[in-house]
Structures are given as C-alpha cells and as structure tokens.
C-alpha cells in the first residue's frame, strides 16, 4: 500500500506545485477565464485610447457646432444690416431732396449703419475705388496748355460721428487715410497739368485760416479757393473763364442743386457723415 501511495503523493505534489506557479502569473476571473498581465495592460491602454478619442471627438463636434452658430449669427446680423441700409437710404434721399438736416432727420439706427461701415473698412475701400476711378478718367484726357482746364475738389468733410468714443479710433484712422488719399489725388492731377480749384463751405471771413490749414496739410499752388457754398458768384466767375473738366465732392449738394456745375464729369466721394448710407453696401 505504501508503495502505491508514495508515487501518487509525488504526482499530486507535482500537480499542486505546478498549479501554484501558474496561478502566480495569471489573474483569475470568477467566470473561469484567465488574462495575462500583458493582455491586461493592452486592454487598459485600449480603454484609455478610446476615451481620449471620444473626448477629442466631442471637442471637435462642439467646435463645429459653435462655428456654425457663429456663422448663422453673422448671417442674421448681415441681413439686419442690409435691411437697415435700405431703410436709411430712403430717409437720407428724402432729406437731401428737401435740403433737410440729416443729423436731425435720420434716426440713430442710420448712425450705427454708417459707423459699422467705417469699422468694417468699407468706407476706405469705397474711397480708394472712387479715387482710382477718377484718376483713370483724367488720364484718358489731356488738358490744354492755356491753363483753363480745371478740376474742382471739395475740401470739406463735416464729421458728425466724432462724438462716439467707441468708434473713435476707427473714425480717426479713416480720416487720416482719407487725407492722404485726397492729397495724393490733388498732387497727381496738378502734375498732369490741371489747374486745381478748392471749394469750402466756410464763410469768407475764414479764408486766411483755411489757407493756412491747407498749407499745413501739404496743399499748394491751387488756382482758386472758393469760399461759402451760399454764394455761387465765385463759381459762376470761374466757369466764365475756365473749362471745368471735373468736380470731386464729398456731398451731393456740391455736385448738384444750386451749384449745377457745367462739368464733363462728377465724382461723389464717400464721406464720414450721415449721407454715407446712400453709398453703403454691405459686402
């Protein structure tokens, strides 16, 4: 009996020892499945990677939704601005036809439209385009050598928007850029042989002050300085002795109305006043 028992005990002892060593390198699961440490590490890493991917996907979706929402808001704002533009355009045209004060006639909504136009850079783009259009026209014709071919430039631009502190930096920058562009236009036309005539709304009593101001801004060698828009006699005298090739003005009343220039071409420059809404077009 002991002879048979001894080998059997050795076998059971070997099985027990082998089982203990295998359990040392495996994780036991109640279902009876076993997982090595390497497989467990891979499984955990996969879960972490999947979680990171899901978070990244959620962030991407959130960003896309926010972008779409912002785009929709921008479209709605543009539509509202277009509607406001049409509304202000009618009121502005009515004010000009009846020689009314636009500052008192137009609502603050129109003021906001004009301010947005300046802030978004539309004003300067339109100004530069108009100046280039004028230069292109004057380059197609050649003034005669008798110094009788003149170009009239309106040098006034009454700024009704300076009170708004929020837009002040945009307005000041627009004014600065405009002064540079207009002076360049003036110098270019003068170099082509045109006699330059400057037009101001200021009263005759401010002529000397106006001359000094023009010189300080870089203007020189003009042939005439017409003062006071209420007195058209200076304009009539100019037309009797000169050929007005073109008139470049900031305001409609300078180009039409009582002035009624006998000019070959009129150019309306965008200005920094309420009547700009006539030229406003959201792009």
Swiss-Prot record:
Q: Does the keyword Membrane apply?
A: yes
Q: Where are the transmembrane segments?
A: 41-61
* Matching Pfam families: Acid_phosphat_B
Q: Which InterPro entries match?
A: Acid_phosphat_B-like, HAD_sf
**Record's keyword terms, sorted:** Membrane, Transmembrane, Transmembrane helix
Which residues lie within the region annotated Disordered?
Answer: 1-21
Cellular compartment(s): Membrane
Membrane topology (UniProt): Single-pass membrane protein
Q: Name one GO cellular component term.
A: membrane
- Which PANTHER family does the entry mention? ACID PHOSPHATASE, ACID PHOSPHATASE-LIKE PROTEIN
Record-stated family: Belongs to the APS1/VSP family.
Mind telling me what this protein is named?
A: Uncharacterized protein At2g39920
């Amino acid at each position: 009996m002991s002879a048979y028992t001894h080998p059997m005990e050795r076998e059971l002892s070997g099985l027990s020892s082998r089982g203990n060593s295998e359990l040392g390198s495996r994780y036991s699961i109640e279902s009876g499945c076993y997982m090595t440490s390497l497989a467990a590490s891979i499984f955990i890493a996969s879960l972490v990677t999947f979680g990171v991917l899901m978070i990244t996907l959620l962030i991407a979706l959130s960003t896309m939704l926010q972008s779409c929402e912002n785009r929709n808001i921008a479209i709605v704002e543009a539509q509202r601005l277009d509607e406001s533009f049409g509304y202000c355009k009618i009121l502005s045209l009515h004010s000009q036809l009846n020689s009314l004060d636009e500052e008192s006639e137009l609502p603050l909504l129109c003021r906001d439209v004009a301010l947005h136009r300046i802030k978004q850079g539309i004003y300067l783009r339109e100004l530069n385009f108009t100046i280039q259009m004028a230069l292109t026209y004057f380059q197609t014709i050649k003034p005669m050598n008798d110094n009788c071919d003149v170009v009239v430039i309106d040098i006034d631009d009454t700024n009704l928007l300076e009170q708004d502190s929020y837009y002040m930096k945009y307005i000041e920058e627009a004014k600065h850029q405009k002064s540079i562009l207009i002076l360049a236009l003036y110098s270019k036309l003068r170099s082509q042989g045109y006699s330059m005539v400057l037009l101001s709304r200021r009263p005759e009593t401010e002529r000397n002050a106006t001359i000094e101001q023009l010189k300080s801004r870089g203007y020189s060698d003009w042939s005439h300085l017409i003062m006071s828009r209420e007195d058209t006699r200076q304009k009539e005298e100019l037309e009797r002795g000169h050929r007005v090739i073109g008139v470049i003005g900031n305001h409609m009343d300078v180009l039409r109305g009582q002035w009624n220039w006998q000019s070959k071409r009129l150019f309306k420059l965008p200005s920094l006043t309420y009547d700009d809404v006539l030229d406003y077009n959201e792009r």
